[in-house]
Amino acid sequence: FLPAIAGVAAKFLPKIFCAISKKC
């Protein structure tokens, strides 16, 4: 369960950070 959350976070956090910071 926890590794799945970590995998999803690792997949989506960069995209969210990219969208917020506008640094892609």
From Swiss-Prot:
Reported tissue expression: Expressed by the skin glands.
Mostly located where?
Answer: secreted
Biological process (GO) annotations held by this record are: defense response to bacterium; defense response to fungus; killing of cells of another organism
Q: Does the keyword Secreted apply?
A: yes
Q: Which residues form a coiled coil?
A: none
Q: What is this protein called?
A: Brevinin-1Bd
Function as written in the Swiss-Prot or TrEMBL entry: Antibacterial activity against Gram-positive bacterium S.aureus and Gram-negative bacterium E.coli. Has activity against C.albicans.
| Homology family | Belongs to the frog skin active peptide (FSAP) family. Brevinin subfamily.
Q: Where in the cell is it found?
A: Secreted
Q: Which organism is it from?
A: Lithobates berlandieri (Rio Grande leopard frog)
Could you name the domain of life of the organism this protein comes from? Eukaryota
Q: Name one GO cellular component term.
A: extracellular region
